[in-house]
Amino acid sequence: MTNDSIELGINCELVSGAVANDVKPSPDPLSFPLQEMVGFTIDKGDGAATASLDVDERHLNPHGVVHGGIPFMMLDTAMGAAVMSVIPEGYWCTTIDIHTRFLRPCGVGHISATATVRRAGRRVVHVDAIVTDT
């Protein structure tokens, strides 16, 4: 595989406290059932985060390539983790807009989604992210 990538930009809106249906934030925002089922891990730092996955056959679509929802979910999660690293405690974020461009498919191997905060305003945080495979 070549080292082409998937590019993604995101805008997140900051939310303070509980929202509709009294949803309570997870005590560990880097771990949730869907993430555990898919099997990717998250590492975050100051203004950045990376989601990593060892792709196997369960992640492939009927055409033998990674289902597009897998890297998309990893990107969204990494970007959310990057945002959470720069916003005040007690706040959380929700994605308000995502634009993706899939440049080529990925197969079995290792993929990483790396997100970096580009600009953090008072209510909206802009994040850039990219998926690479090895």
Positions of predicted regions on the chain:
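Terminal targeting signals and extreme-terminal segments of soluble enzymes
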Residues: 1-134
